């Protein structure tokens, strides 16, 4: 797999996990497995990964009422990974240069 990491998932809850437990949350490709995610994080950020938990998130259903009636749709399903790093290690999301080659998918 080329690069399973899509983007860091920055929310209030994920920021709390980072500050309290040293866990970082990423949105990853749906077909990525834990070994691919571990390799990508270790290579990109030069850290040791202790554990990874993955979550398959279902896309929300959306409805819109129009003159022609109800239009129903669904957002895409996605996957996120919670990565725990070794003791004393950290990732600085903003210091990493943006890789333009990763955005081809």
Swiss-Prot record:
Give a yes or no for keyword RNA-binding in this entry. yes
Keyword annotations for this protein, in alphabetical order, are: Ribonucleoprotein, Ribosomal protein, RNA-binding, rRNA-binding
Q: Which top-level group of life is the source organism from? A: Bacteria
One GO molecular-function annotation for this sequence? rRNA binding
- InterPro entries membership: Nucleotide-bd_a/b_plait_sf (IPR012677), Ribosomal_uL23-like (IPR013025), Ribosomal_uL23/eL15/eS24_sf (IPR012678)
Q: Which Gene3D superfamilies match?
A: 3.30.70.330
This protein's GO CC annotations: ribonucleoprotein complex; ribosome
Q: What residue stretch is flagged as signal peptide?
A: none
Q: A Gene Ontology biological process annotation?
A: translation
* Pfam families listed in its UniProt record: Ribosomal_L23
PANTHER family reported for this sequence: 60S RIBOSOMAL PROTEIN L23A (PTHR11620)
How it assembles, according to the record, is:
Part of the 50S ribosomal subunit. Contacts protein L29, and trigger factor when it is bound to the ribosome.
* Entry-linked NCBIfam families: PRK05738.1-3 (NF004359), PRK05738.2-4 (NF004363)
Q: What's this chain's function?
A: One of the early assembly proteins it binds 23S rRNA. One of the proteins that surrounds the polypeptide exit tunnel on the outside of the ribosome. Forms the main docking site for trigger factor binding to the ribosome.
The similarity comment for this entry is: Belongs to the universal ribosomal protein uL23 family.
According to UniProt, the name of this protein is: Large ribosomal subunit protein uL23
Q: Which organism is it from?
A: Chlorobaculum parvum (strain DSM 263 / NCIMB 8327)
């Amino acid at each position: 797999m080329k690069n399973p990491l899509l983007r860091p998932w920055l929310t209030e809850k994920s920021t709390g996990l980072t500050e309290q437990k040293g866990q970082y949350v990423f949105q990853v490709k749906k077909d990525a497995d834990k070994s691919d995610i571990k390799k990508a994080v270790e290579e990109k950020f030069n850290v040791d990964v202790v554990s990874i938990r993955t979550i398959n998130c279902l896309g929300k259903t959306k409805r819109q009422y129009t003159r022609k009636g109800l239009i129903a749709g669904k957002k895409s399903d996605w996957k996120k990974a919670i990565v725990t790093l070794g003791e004393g290690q950290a990732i600085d999301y903003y210091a990493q240069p943006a890789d333009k080659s990763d955005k081809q998918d």
